[in-house]
Amino acid sequence: MSLDTAEKQKLIETHQVHATDTGSVEVQVAMLSKRISKLSEHLQGNIHDFASRQGLLKMIGKRKRLLSYIKDKNVQKYQDLVKKIGIRG
């Protein structure tokens, strides 16, 4: 489940670090989180879509690694990002 251009642009604008930022870790995590939520909704109705389930697990792993990187570099940024995106309880 991909994101359309308008959704990507909105995510970039809300999570960018500076004016021309499109690929910072914060933006990547936000995009992955949105894709994960869309794919999770898809899998609720299509329980036998194993290829999509595999893709979902890969995306979750990538997001976990990116969040770990942010946490190692700056704990305050990590906490703000987790709160802003609404993940991890």
Swiss-Prot record:
Keyword Ribonucleoprotein recorded: yes
Keyword list, A-Z: Ribonucleoprotein, Ribosomal protein, RNA-binding, rRNA-binding
GO CC term (a single one): cytosolic small ribosomal subunit
GO annotation (BP), single: translation
SUPFAM superfamilies named among the record's database cross-references: S15/NS1 RNA-binding domain
GO molecular function: rRNA binding; structural constituent of ribosome
Listed SMART domains: Ribosomal_S15
Keyword Ribonucleoprotein appears in the UniProt entry: yes
Pfam families per record: Ribosomal_S15
Domain of life per record: Bacteria
Binding partners and assembly: Part of the 30S ribosomal subunit. Forms a bridge to the 50S subunit in the 70S ribosome, contacting the 23S rRNA.
Family (UniProt): Belongs to the universal ribosomal protein uS15 family.
PANTHER family in alphabetical order: RIBOSOMAL PROTEIN S15, BACTERIAL AND ORGANELLAR, SMALL RIBOSOMAL SUBUNIT PROTEIN US15M
Function per UniProt: One of the primary rRNA binding proteins, it binds directly to 16S rRNA where it helps nucleate assembly of the platform of the 30S subunit by binding and bridging several RNA helices of the 16S rRNA. Forms an intersubunit bridge (bridge B4) with the 23S rRNA of the 50S subunit in the ribosome.
Protein name, UniProt field: Small ribosomal subunit protein uS15
Species this protein is from: Prochlorococcus marinus (strain MIT 9312)
Lineage: Bacteria, Bacillati, Cyanobacteriota, Cyanophyceae, Synechococcales
